[in-house]
């Protein structure tokens, strides 16, 4: 299990106890700094004060469990307009929206695709309508995905 997934399972109960959805979390390095980025949401959106409240709760859990080696920075925020997509339910929720996905392994010599989410089946296979074709990929093939904001219509 990846460290991000382990962290997700560790902090989810604390976030949900406050009445928020834990959209996802990512652990990465920015220069010499380790960053734990946590995305939280609720119907109607989440504000800065609520993010601070969640941050304090997560910090308390992480201080006790100490799952990250060394120093790190905790960033808690809303997922934003171009929110990341992690689960089949995220894709289902945004059927009809445009997304950008990056595959773990190239398909037809390409790893990045942009298209409209048109379906998600029970086997967690996501279907995207690209410009001129349909792309079907399993969640396990997707390295990273997020919604695309299209302001041009």
From Swiss-Prot:
Gene3D superfamilies per record: Ribosome maturation factor RimP, C-terminal domain (2.30.30.180), RimP-like superfamily, N-terminal (3.30.300.70)
InterPro entries per UniProt: Ribosome_maturation_RimP, RimP_C, RimP_C_sf, RimP_N, RimP_N_sf
May I have one GO cellular component term? Answer: cytosol
Q: What is this protein called?
A: Ribosome maturation factor RimP
Q: Which domain of life is it from?
A: Bacteria
Q: Does the keyword Cytoplasm apply?
A: yes
Task: Please give the PANTHER family that the UniProt record associates with this protein.
Answer: RIBOSOME MATURATION FACTOR RIMP
Q: What does this protein do?
A: Required for maturation of 30S ribosomal subunits.
Its lineage opens with: Bacteria, Pseudomonadati, Pseudomonadota, Gammaproteobacteria, Legionellales
